[in-house]
Amino acid sequence: MLEAIVKVRSVNEFAATYGSPRVWLELRRQGFRVGRKRVERVMRTHDLQGAHLRRGWKHGSTRQHPERRGAPDLLNRDFRAKAPNRTWVADRTRLITGEGVLWLASVRDAFANRVVGWAVDPRATTELVLAALDHALASRQVHTGQLIFHSDKGAQYTALRFTQRLVDAGIAPSTGSVGDSFDNALAENLWSTLKIELVYWPGTTFATRAEAEHALLRYIDGWYNPRRIQAGLGGLSPDEYEQAHRQDPEHR
């Protein structure tokens, strides 16, 4: 059993972040008939620990433009989506590098938690969140009147240029209240996952912004979307969950 566990945690540079719950799910996917408690016991005995949130970590605050109210909240904390491209959630966060701050903006599809667009920039500007949105629009098929785009009331997301881009694409803008992380919990959840498993993983440092961007590319496009399994998706990765949806005869 130890050999199988070590193999699960060795298939990718980020697989070592798996704790016993995900290791157990992956073993079940591979056909092992093993109990979750046994996996926990073996990993504890051999000091195999997964990633965990460091104490004291907090997400950054939102700065609302004083003259912009933002769109109404169309979700009211209900982030469930019956199909892809029905609800997208967005946020931005910052990473520290040897060259200074690098801001990351992302767009996440609520159906399978897949990151459908992201962008980086040294500054948290409207151009940054527009770049992430354009990445998402280029990678997905969006139908007019079917998609809600939810964010906080940050100045970047309430900027006229950004709102107009949504309207032009046939997307309904939605914003949560100021200072309440629960109103954009699905988007912010990505940051805790990314920082636990990448940014704060022991030994991780970014000498340059380019180095950080390359690490994000490996994590998001090479691990999180295609391979990182989630209990809420039935032990599938976001890509696998969407593929299963497409192959379901009821959704063709």
Model-identified regions with their sequence ranges:
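Charged DNA-binding/catalytic regions of mobile-element recombinases
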Residues: M1-R252
